[in-house]
């Protein structure tokens, strides 16, 4: 599966690399699991609704979420910080 970062997700990823290595490792685990099983697995995957219909989220921790969308063989990361 090809990994694509939206601009916001890339900025979030760079932020975590500079500020919290533990969260960076957690994001790596979530991405790896999502490429294998996009709609099940770790981080409590859940489909989003309303304006974000078609996107899914997984818990990075109690405060932050990884928001993503699967399109064919592409994994689009939309957000890696905050709670949508």
Q: Where are the regions that the model predicts?
A:
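Enriched for short, Lys/Arg-rich terminal
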Residues: 2, 8-25, 29, 42, ...
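A short, surface-exposed loop/turn module that caps and links secondary-structure elements
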Residues: 32-59
């Amino acid at each position: 599966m090809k990994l694509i970062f939206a601009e916001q997700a890339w900025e979030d990823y760079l932020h975590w690399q500079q500020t919290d290595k533990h969260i960076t490792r957690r994001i790596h685990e979530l991405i790896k699991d999502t490429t294998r099983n996009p709609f099940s697995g770790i981080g409590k995957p859940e489909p989003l609704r309303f304006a974000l219909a078609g996107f899914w989220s997984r818990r990075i921790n109690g405060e932050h979420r990884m928001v993503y969308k699967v399109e064919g063989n592409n994994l689009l990361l939309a957000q890696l910080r905050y709670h949508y």
